[in-house]
C-alpha cells in the first residue's frame, strides 16, 4: 500500500516556497472551487515544483490576480512516506486517484483538470491534513478501485 502524508498550506505560494525542490509530490490547489490536482517527479519534473513552476511564472501569477496570496484558496502537498520505493507510475496513479475522488463529489465544473481516462487500481492511505474531499478515504480506509 502507498501512503501519502498531506500538509495544508494557506495558499500555493506558501507551499511552493517550502517544498519547491521536493521530488515525487502530489499537490492540490484549492479545495472546493477552482481545484487543480497535479504532481511532480515524472515527465522531466525531477527538480520538483521549482522546475514545473519556475519562479518568474509564480511572480507573474501574482500580477495576474493582483495579490500576493490567493483569497480563501488553500493548497495541499502530499508526500510519499517511502519515496525511495515510489515509481513514476505510482506518482501518476495517485494523482489520477485523487482527481477521481474530487470528480466523484459531483463538482466537475470546479475541476481545473481533465478527467483521467482510467481509474487506477491501487491502494492508497492518506494521513495528515488531507483535503476535505479525501477525508472519507483517510487513515485506515485507504482508497482503491
Segments from the language model and where they lie:
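Boundary/linker segments flanking structured domains
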Residues: 1-35, 41-145
